[in-house]
Amino acid sequence: MPDMGTPLLTIQGMASPGELLNLSLNAKAILPEGFVLLALIGTLLVDLAGEEISKRWSPPICYAGLGSALIILGFGWNQSPESAFLGAFIADNFSIAFRAVVALSTLISLLISWRYAEQSGSPVGEYAAILLAATLGAMLLCGSTDLISIFISLETLSVASYLLAGYLKRDARSSEAALKYLLVGSAAAAVFLYGASLLYGLSGSTSLESIGIALQTSPTPLAALALVFILATVAFKIAAVPFHQWTPDVYEGSPTPVVAFLSVGSKAAGFALAVRILVGCFNAFDDQWKLLFTVLAVLSMTLGNVVALAQTSMKRMLAYSSIGQAGFVMIGLVCGTEEGYAAMILYMAAYLFMNLGAFACIILFSLRTGSDRIADYAGLYQKDPLITLGLSLCLLSLGGIPPMLGFFGKIYLFFAGWSDGQYLLVIVGLVTSVVSIYYYISVIKMMVVKEPQEASELVKAYPLIQWNSIGMPTLRFALLTCVFATAIGGVLSNPLFKWANSAVAGTPLLQEALTLAAEKGAIG
């Protein structure tokens, strides 16, 4: 029987059809994804039984599937890495950490979705099934180690995301967002395929490990061209400048719960892909891709936070904010040190809670007013202290104000960057963090400082809270959970630091990269 690490196409070429049937695919490694798939099928089945049955049973089915996936991921922590699908997927600590972020972001996104779907008249079962399909693609992408599995996972995530963006069929802005996302995403997929074909032609393999070895022995200009194509796809997925143009329009036009998932789950999968393919495949071009990522990080932090200053829509402001946040996370990737990788993982976990908490508040406000204009939040503290407090804490955390969770995440990133000599990135990060604090505090000031007579017309006509309505208890629970984690997580951040460090320590790919970097430094 061929080794599990043997490239997929190599095995297919040397084995007969009968032998292929006897190969172990080691489905245990993808058991969490299996539960997500079962939940997806379950939601489709109950949706066939009628809308009322779907509304009743879709939420518990989703909770059971995602909860089971998170529990199994927890049991797999710090275990020996396992390969699946003939070496096309690996379950190590790094993939477990990012798969957990994706699954948890989906769970919270669903908790804040039910009331929104009910009020907009959207079919609940279909929405949940498409979101679970996107989750399945994102989770598989986090552990993919073969060009074929990467492309399949990437397209599963992308196609489901296009459908989610245009889910409000009667809303012209939602349809426009879906079309823009589809066109740009299709171009990114074509660019990735071209880069992947070059890599396969140069190495004769689709395995990232085999490609990395081939490029180290004979780096060529064609490999550098493939790097540019692959990097463009990664930058599109994480919404880095200048591949960010789709982000503001898609975020503004898409349903708000969908935007919440795209801003965290999809972005986390993009960063997992970046590490897998750049660290595992392009070690021979280490200096080149780090230089390119440095430029992307500086542009993303600068443009994202500066343009956010001029926004009047809350969702567009958070769209540009997410571009800036991607720039911060890239600091850890550019460092290429143990502290850098750990800081990147830690910040993605922190970003999960503070960003989804902010979106939960925005959804709650839009459900009552139908608006996402920043000016309409004026004087909100008088009518809704919960949204005011929750949104204020989450925005302060995104800005990096102590003692919020986001502060410790940024400090860890800046510390890792400074220790590695990435002074430009750290300085730009500090300056743009100050800029971001300005527009975050402007929103807080709008909600809190305004006198009663200066409150917006929508706030003056603010309806009474009906917490017993369908979907409202889960929305409140998600909001309180995210706000609590954002506020208290900073004070109790030591377990998160240990978790992020063990994610790096339990990942052979990162340990090999660190060893190579140390040897290179010793020779230099």
From Swiss-Prot:
Pfam families: Proton_antipo_M
Reactions listed under catalytic activity: a plastoquinone + NADH + (n+1) H(+)(in) = a plastoquinol + NAD(+) + n H(+)(out); a plastoquinone + NADPH + (n+1) H(+)(in) = a plastoquinol + NADP(+) + n H(+)(out)
GO molecular-function term, one example from the UniProt record: NADH dehydrogenase (ubiquinone) activity
E.C. number: 7.1.1.-
Subcellular location: Cellular thylakoid membrane
Database matches in InterPro entries: NADH-Q_OxRdtase_suN/2, ND/Mrp_TM
Major localization listed first in the record, in broad terms: membrane
CC per GO annotation: plasma membrane-derived thylakoid membrane
Name of the top EC class for this enzyme: translocase
Keyword set includes Metal-binding: no
Gene Ontology terms describing biological process: ATP synthesis coupled electron transport; photosynthesis, light reaction
UniProt membrane topology term: Multi-pass membrane protein
Keywords, in A-Z order: Membrane, NAD, NADP, Plastoquinone, Quinone, Thylakoid, Translocase, Transmembrane, Transmembrane helix, Transport
TM region(s), chain numbering: 29-49, 57-77, 94-114, 124-141, 146-168, 182-202, 223-243, 255-275, 291-311, 317-337, 345-365, 389-409, 424-444, 477-497
Self-association and partners: NDH-1 can be composed of about 15 different subunits; different subcomplexes with different compositions have been identified which probably have different functions.
Family: Belongs to the complex I subunit 2 family.
Role according to the record: NDH-1 shuttles electrons from an unknown electron donor, via FMN and iron-sulfur (Fe-S) centers, to quinones in the respiratory and/or the photosynthetic chain. The immediate electron acceptor for the enzyme in this species is believed to be plastoquinone. Couples the redox reaction to proton translocation, and thus conserves the redox energy in a proton gradient. Cyanobacterial NDH-1 also plays a role in inorganic carbon-concentration.
NCBIfam families linked: NDH_I_N (TIGR01770), PRK02504.1 (NF002701)
Protein name listed in UniProt: NAD(P)H-quinone oxidoreductase subunit 2
Protein species of origin: Prochlorococcus marinus (strain SARG / CCMP1375 / SS120)
